[in-house]
Amino acid sequence: MRKLLDKLYKASGFLAAGFLVLICAVVSAQVVLNLITKIFGTAYSFTIPSYADFAGFFLASASFLALAYTLTRGGHIRVTLLIQTFGRIPRLAAELFSLSFGALMSAFATYYMIRLNIESFGFGDLSFGIIAIPIWIPQLAVSGGLAMLTIAFVDLIWLTLRAGRPVLKNMDSE
């Protein structure tokens, strides 16, 4: 089970990185097309329809798919100034409280995002723009990212309880 979860977190991180590459590709292609228009005039004026919409969808996908991977690698911002003064038991309690609160909030967001996803699919909602995309498609990555984050929080709660100490390390301390 541990290997499966780690592979899921990595896959989510790789998907997020892939969406960042897509943002770079779409925006770079549009910049090149703008340069061609500038150099050769409006006779060679080309544009990628809805490129800003696509870049926005890719950004939302990358952001939410990266959450679980970043959390499990200790990359999220953590306030250690206060908790480093705690003893072992209060620090463990603070860690479990924050992980549990994160899991509850993430589960809440996941539930309602999936409901929104289903409604968007059912109503046939489309994005605004030159190319109308069924909005449930980009919402799917957000739902998946939130679901992965919820799983990661529950996983970290379990690992913390089993270890009897906080298991997350800050990336800046490595």
Locations of the language-model features?
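Alpha-helical transmembrane segments and membrane-interface helix-loop junctions
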Residues: 1-174
